[in-house]
Design a protein with these regions (language model features):
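Bacterial Sec-dependent N-terminal signal peptides
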Residues: 1-30, 319-320, 380-381
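A domain-start/cap signature at the N-terminus of enzymes
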Residues: 26-62, 75, 89, 118, ...
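Serine-hydrolase catalytic machinery in alpha/beta-hydrolase-like enzymes
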Residues: 37-53, 57-145, 149, 158, ...
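The conserved beta1-alpha1 loop
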Residues: 64-68, 174, 203-204, 283
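Acidic beta-to-alpha connecting loop that harbors the catalytic carboxylate
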Residues: 99, 205-208, 284-286
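The feature captures the conserved acid-bearing segment of alpha/beta-hydrolase catalytic domains
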Residues: 168-169, 174-248, 254-261, 267-273
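C-terminal outer-membrane/trafficking sorting elements
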Residues: 323-395
């Protein structure tokens, strides 16, 4: 008869308990399709897409994508904004929630139009989805993003305001932001972000929808809410994020001359934690999703992910404050024209990136970078071994 090793038994039971506690995460079955959740005694749905290379050992981001008013996730995904390919390429969880009926209008919507009574709690519906997915999958809780089209874009701003403890950044296409002062009659508190928040907006100057007019709408029109202009939106978020007052402005190459529109890119840099506010102003653009309808010079899907993925709830990922730059390293001239030189670096890998995180060139040791063919704009130089970076400007 053998004796039990109690130390071994304790370790075994501890390990068994640990695995049981986390089994729903470690052994979650990847399921792509509609899932249900009961929220406020109402059965709600969302379309979930988990990339094939998901691993429970590697926490990954979540991107919510919200359909417009009167829409549904499947039609929206198939005909307006299909980001499943991006989710596969960049390894993030993609979620298309489904809105419910506004009791005051009978239409499918994210924003309650009622002027009295308690508004629907759609913000907590999204919070409940985040909690459910985080229970079943390994999620990077600092990298949860939201985007949407039309009313879905408006709702993305609402999440940036009212679920900011969970949301790192948002992007809105053809959807304005509600004025917090005018929202008071719906029972909401003022917009109250808690951390530097990355914001992208893609508005059309010729959009005729009342809730997404470039110049704002409709104070004095006897409507329930006031929708901010594009300039008011960027002013609010650049002030909150403490970015540069003057944006970097450039014209996007007009690759499609038949779509009747062009794009101007405006980027407000150097916000708290390195966050940015970016506007892709579609000049001549209507109530569209660029790359699918209307303007074809950009793909809004790619623009949104390239922008949001640079940030987490702490700001720009791997951002360094200028006070931490190594004083022995000198980059000159800056601003530069046809070249710049890096001094004070030995046997270090030096990488040059553009404003959108694309690697332009890499070198080792002190060296001269020939920049004759680079476009004017902002670039970032990263010295790997010293873990420092410089912002450079080509004039």
């Amino acid at each position: 008869m053998f004796k039990i090793n109690y130390c071994f038994r304790y370790r075994f039971l501890y390990l068994l308990g640990f695995l049981f506690a986390f089994s729903s995460n470690l052994f979650a079955q990847i399921y792509n399709g509609f899932q249900s959740i009961n929220h406020n005694q109402i059965d709600r749905r969302f379309y979930l897409y988990v990339p094939n290379n998901y691993s429970a050992n590697n926490p990954i981001p979540i991107l919510f994508n919200f359909h417009g008013g009167g829409g549904d996730p499947v039609t929206y995904m198939n005909y307006t904004s299909d980001m499943r390919g991006l989710a596969e390429e960049n390894n993030f969880i993609l979620v298309y929630p489904e809105a419910t009926t506004d009791p005051s209008t009978g239409s499918i919507s994210w924003i309650d139009k009622a002027t009295n009574g308690a508004p629907r709690d759609e913000t907590n519906f999204i919070d409940a989805i985040i909690n459910l997915i985080s229970r079943d999958y390994s999620v990077d809780s600092d990298r949860i993003y939201a985007c949407g089209y039309s009313e879905g874009g408006i709702f993305s701003y609402e999440l940036a305001c009212r679920l900011n403890n969970k949301i790192a950044g948002i992007a809105s296409v053809s959807g304005s932001m509600l004025s917090e002062s005018e929202r008071s009659n719906l029972g909401f508190s003022s917009c109250s972000p808690q951390h530097p928040t990355a914001i992208m907006l893609i508005p059309g100057t010729d959009d005729t929808n009342a809730h997404s007019l470039y110049q704002g709408c409709c104070l004095g029109w006897n409507l329930d809410s006031y929708y901010l202009s594009a300039n008011e939106i960027t002013e609010y978020w650049t002030n909150f994020n403490s970015t540069d007052n003057i944006p970097s402005v450039s014209d996007v190459t007009n690759t499609n001359t038949l779509d009747g529109s062009t794009i101007q890119r405006k980027i407000w840099l150097n916000g708290d934690g390195g966050v940015e506010v970016q506007e892709l102003k579609v000049i001549g653009g209507a109530h569209d999703w660029p790359g699918t309808s209307g303007n074809m010079d950009i793909d809004a899907n790619n623009e949104i992910w390239q922008f949001l993925s640079k940030f987490d709830k702490n700001g720009m990922i791997n951002n360094l404050n200028i006070e931490d730059f190594h004083k022995s390293v000198l980059v000159t001239p800056n601003p530069f024209n046809n070249f710049f030189k890096v001094k004070g670096v030995e046997n270090d890998l030096i990488e040059l990136y553009d404003l959108f995180g694309r690697k332009i060139e890499c070198k080792i040791n002190d060296d001269i970078f020939n920049t004759e063919n680079l476009k004017r704009g902002v670039y970032f130089l990263i010295i790997k071994e010293k873990n420092i970076s410089f912002k450079l400007v080509k004039s």
